[in-house]
Structures are given as C-alpha cells and as structure tokens.
Amino acid sequence: MVIFLAVLFGIVGLDRLVIVYLFPVLLPELKLNNTQAGAIASVLALTWAISTWVLGSLSDRYGRRKILLGSSIFFSVMTSFTGVAKSFHSMLLVRGLLGVGEGGVFSASVATIDEISTPRRRGLNLGIHQSFFPLLGIGLGPIIATQLVMHMRWEWVFFVLGIPGFLLTFLIGKTMRKAEASRDKQARSASASPLTVLRYKNIWLTTVIGSLFQTGLFVFSTFVALYLTKVVGLSLGTVGLIISGWGFGGFIGMIAVPAMSDRLGRRIVLVVSAACYGVLMLAFVLCHASPIVMFCNLFAAGICGFGIAPLFLAVIPCESVPSTLTGSAVGVPTAVSELIGGVLMPVVAGGLADTFGLGYPMLIVGGVSLVSALVGMFLEETVPTATSKRSVSNMDAV
C-alpha cells in the first residue's frame, strides 16, 4: 500500500511541475511573461492549499478511501486537459482545478500511511511516500518533459502524462477496499473541529517552516529552467539533466533523513538539514560552475532540503495530535505554506525577475532555508518512545 501511494504522489509531483520545465516552450507560444508564468504556478498552489485542508478534514470524518480515489481521478483528468488550454486564463482555470485534486491526494494519502504505520516506521514510511514527489516530479520530470517535447507537441505531453494517474487509482482502489472498511467507520465517528489542531504548538511552527520551505521550492522550480537557459546560457536538454540532480537527491533524502530522525530525533535532524540546504542553494547561484558541478550541488541540496519535507509536512504534525485529527494536522501546515510559498511568492519572484533579472529569485531560496533552520530549533520533540504517540492528547497545547 505504501508503495502504491508513493508512486501516486510521485505522479502528482510530475503532473504539477512538468509545466515549469516546458515554460521555455510555452511562454513564447502563448505570449506570456515571467509574472504570468509565476501566476500559473501559483494558482495550483492556491487550490492545493484549500483542498488539502478541506478534503483532509473530510477524510477524517468520512474516510480516506473516498477522498483519495475521487481526488486521484480528478487530477488525472485535469492533467490531460492542460493540453487543451491555449491562453493565459484557460491555463489558470485548468491548473487551478488540477490543484484541487492533488491537494486531496496529499492529505488523504499521508493520513492513510500514518494509520497503517507502526510508530518506529512512521518516519521511514512517510519518507518513502513523499520521496517519489522529487523522484518523478523533479528527478525524472525535467528529463521526461524535455525529451517528450522534442518528439511531440507540448499539448500531447500533458495528454500522455494523464494516463498513469488513472492506472494507479484503479490499483489503489482494489488494494484499499478491505483494509479501509474499519478505518472508515472509525473516521466517521470523529467530531472534533478541524481548527482544534491549532491548539498545538508544533502545528504553528511546522506551518512557519513549511511556508519558508515552500517559498524556496516553488520559486526555484518555477524559474530555474528560465534562469539556466536565459542567464547561464545552457541548452534545454542540459538544463533538464542539471535539475534532475535536485530530484534524485531529494528521492534519497526523503527516505534517509526521516529514517535518521526515527533514531536521532525530529528536531535536530530538521535543523541541521535545513541549514545545509540553505548553504548549498546559495552556492548554486553565487558560485558559477560547470554543468556537472551544478548537478552535484543540486543533488546534495536535494538530499538535505527534500529530506526535511516529510518531517514538517507529515511526521511532526501527525505525531503532535490525536489520531482522529491527522488529516487536519497535515492540512493546516500544507494549506498555509502553499498559500504563502506556492501562491504569493512565485508571483513576487516573477515581478523581481521582470524588474531586476532572473538571478534575484534564485537568492530567495537559500535565505528562507536558513531561516527555517532557526525556526526549527523551537519545535517540541515528537519522536516515538516507549509511549505511543496516541497519548499526545495529554500534551500541553498552546
């Protein structure tokens, strides 16, 4: 089940990010500027934010399976429909609807894995789940996108990429059918308000960390292809290979870093990894290097940066609240961080790029990562001990 959900989330990452790798082709053809490119990336983050919170809360009440399967079908349809959009406004509409489905997949799948995992394997399992986002979305995504667009029109790229989501939805539906029955019944009995999770200090802190991280993630992913082609002067094929290092490193980091936190503690692993990530991302922009060095830099940065994402988006929120609130606990940090980091900042960064050049948005990434390391120092440790995390309802709440 974990592997199926992980692959599905990887497809979510691929369908979400593939458009930014095609911006060098799309922007001239659709006559769009950098600010509009940022808006296209931002609208998906906006609807993802809303649906993650809303659909995550609904999955607490009505069960994971219904929300997960419905969201999966919907985002697959919208991925294919992206190939039909031929104007700025139609692209905004389709990509916004895509975010609705993808947000539901994220919150419902994280809550499902939290429920089926033992405390000692929770970090590892959630890390495996989220590791497929950078693997398919950022590691293989640039290669897939840039190679496909060399052999077919960009519209057909989106039609092709919509197919895997339907296949995974069918497989997950068959696998979850029996396992979900008892959990659905338990979920319907949950009556707490989704806002109850705001009583817990760690939810607030992971929300801040998530906002900083998502700022760096989506500013970088939105403009890195444009930066490397227009400023550095590299070919689109070379750019795809360089960016893939970020994703391949992220795949390793999202498994290794949460697994390390199972043994060493969530807080110390998050703080150290975030600090290393910030330094490496600043070096990527400030130190002009060859393509192979840039690949290696992003590979190392991906290990550190993406490695902490399962901690503040899933592991720590889930371990900080009672089991009946895990969907909401995941939804709040994700929703707010998507609104700030995914909606607002790409547009701001696009304005900076139009005014001062594409190098300025790249500097944002390293700076916000260093700040997130500082905020992480104030987290309360949640790593499981002899006492199950389900006794967390007795913890002090803010």
PLM segments and residue spans:
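Helix-breaking motifs and short loop linkers at transmembrane-helix boundaries and internal kinks
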Residues: K31, G63, V84-S90, G233, ...
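Conserved MFS/SLC helix-loop-helix module at the cytosolic interface between two early adjacent transmembrane helices
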Residues: I50-K86, S261-R267
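Extracytoplasmic gate region of multi-pass secondary transporters
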Residues: I19-V20, N202-M254, A314
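C-terminal transmembrane helical hairpin of 12-TM major facilitator-type secondary transporters
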Residues: R267-I316
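Juxtamembrane intracellular "pre-TM" segments in multi-pass secondary transporters
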Residues: A179-T207, A397-V398
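Cytoplasmic helix-loop-helix junction between adjacent transmembrane helices
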Residues: V94-F133
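Helix-loop-helix hairpin linking two adjacent transmembrane segments in secondary transporters
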Residues: H129-K174
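C-terminal membrane-cytosol helix-exit motif in multi-pass small-molecule transporters
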Residues: I163-R183, V375-E380
